[in-house]
Amino acid sequence: METRGIEQMFDFQRLPNDRFILLLLLLYAPVGFCLMLLRIFIGVHVFLVSCALPDSIVRRFIVRIMCSVLGLHVQQNSPRLRDKTTRLYVCNHVTHFDHNIINLLTSCNTPLLEGPVGFLCWARGFMELGQGVGSRTELTETLHRYCSSPDTLPLLLFPEEDTTNGRTGLLKFSSWPFSVSDSIQPVALLVKRPFIAVSTPESSWLTELLWTFFVPFTVYHVRWLPPLSKEDGETHQEFASKVQGLLATELGVISTQITKADKAEHIKRKRHSAPQTAHSNLGARPRTVAQGFLGTSVGAEDSRIARLAQQVKEVLPDVPVSVITRDLLQTNCVDTTITNLLERTDQFNSEAAMTMPSGPGKAAASSTPSAMVSSPNLKPAAKSFGRSPIDRHMSLQERKEALYEYARRRYIEKHGLNKEDDL
């Protein structure tokens, strides 16, 4: 998974970074709050009207006009390309309301794959599948039987299974939506709005709705692509990749292999690294950072990392706990972390030397027993300065090997390990 690529596919920050746009947003904020309250009142009436009127072209026209008052403007290109005989539409996913927007243009049903069922599912415009659908195979079979019925509305599915910002790339299309029907019609969706991002990860649909009412408008561009059918001998995944490439070309973005699971893992990693970065900036006292890190540990994984960090801290007391923890999150091994930190021992020693008080009396008082014990075993400096770069490099390598051997011996003695077992 490419971190750089996945960072560009999602807007993790709602507000803009541009100071001028942020200033305009602050000036607009009082108007936006008043507009949001007014649109909440109007939105209730839009919901009641959509529930009272039967599904028809008249209802879609009236609701579409009322949604324009709510700030949802829908535009479509080449409406004649929409095939009325198509049983399955596939579309890229940008916001929580993509299915509602497509439903303003043509009647279709979108099954609810995740979330609460019941009234809330119906009110949001989803189709409830029932309690019997558990696995992906059962879901595919249920939707396949639904598409085979002649009196049902077309299905609208999102093969990405999660939202993106729609500006950089598409998530990898899942193959199961393309096993529902061999004939599909791709729909390209592009969403734009001023001031703020159209969607952010981990944001609920209710929060997104309030932000939609807050901004002046949100424009949805819908583009209908010609229908496609799966060729003989073509697998469902190959068919999904072909449709993904066509939609990416239409939107001017790239097709990626990043999945919904990769997005969830990246969000989890960012959530985990955020408090760690905050604790690393609190101060220069390692013990305070360690207590702060242990205080925020709520899972077994954090407790294990903290325990490993304490073991490394006992071997290398001069290294800050924040540095040890950051390296352990990457290596997940005490020995590897000790080796990596020993490579940077000169950096820590130079920082300690800069903070050491001047004067012979203070210097003697600030010396630690560990430094006194390690001084005969370690080789902090070469006996003579090498005349050639090779000699100087060998001198540095010898000091590193001595430091590593001392740290290894101290670790074995601390935990009562045998050298044969450790090797």
UniProtKB/Swiss-Prot annotation:
<dbReference type="Pfam" id="PF02845">
    <property type="entry name" value="CUE"/>
</dbReference>
<dbReference type="InterPro" id="IPR003892">
    <property type="entry name" value="CUE"/>
</dbReference>
<dbReference type="GO" id="GO:0005811">
    <property type="term" value="C:lipid droplet"/>
</dbReference>
<feature type="region of interest" description="Disordered">
    <location>
        <begin position="355"/>
        <end position="392"/>
    </location>
</feature>
<protein>
    <recommendedName>
        <fullName>Lipid droplet-regulating VLDL assembly factor AUP1</fullName>
    </recommendedName>
</protein>
<dbReference type="GO" id="GO:1990044">
    <property type="term" value="P:protein localization to lipid droplet"/>
</dbReference>
<feature type="intramembrane region">
    <location>
        <begin position="20"/>
        <end position="40"/>
    </location>
</feature>
<feature type="topological domain" description="Cytoplasmic">
    <location>
        <begin position="41"/>
        <end position="423"/>
    </location>
</feature>
<dbReference type="GO" id="GO:0034389">
    <property type="term" value="P:lipid droplet organization"/>
</dbReference>
<dbReference type="GO" id="GO:0140042">
    <property type="term" value="P:lipid droplet formation"/>
</dbReference>
<comment type="similarity">
    <text>Belongs to the AUP1 family.</text>
</comment>
<keyword id="KW-0551">Lipid droplet</keyword>
<feature type="topological domain" description="Cytoplasmic">
    <location>
        <begin position="1"/>
        <end position="19"/>
    </location>
</feature>
<keyword id="KW-0472">Membrane</keyword>
<dbReference type="GO" id="GO:0043130">
    <property type="term" value="F:ubiquitin binding"/>
</dbReference>
<keyword id="KW-0256">Endoplasmic reticulum</keyword>
<dbReference type="GO" id="GO:0036503">
    <property type="term" value="P:ERAD pathway"/>
</dbReference>
<feature type="compositionally biased region" description="Polar residues">
    <location>
        <begin position="365"/>
        <end position="377"/>
    </location>
</feature>
<feature type="domain" description="CUE">
    <location>
        <begin position="304"/>
        <end position="346"/>
    </location>
</feature>
<dbReference type="GO" id="GO:0005789">
    <property type="term" value="C:endoplasmic reticulum membrane"/>
</dbReference>
<dbReference type="InterPro" id="IPR048056">
    <property type="entry name" value="AUP1_CUE"/>
</dbReference>
<comment type="function">
    <text>Plays a role in the translocation of terminally misfolded proteins from the endoplasmic reticulum lumen to the cytoplasm and their degradation by the proteasome. Plays a role in lipid droplet formation. Induces lipid droplet clustering.</text>
</comment>
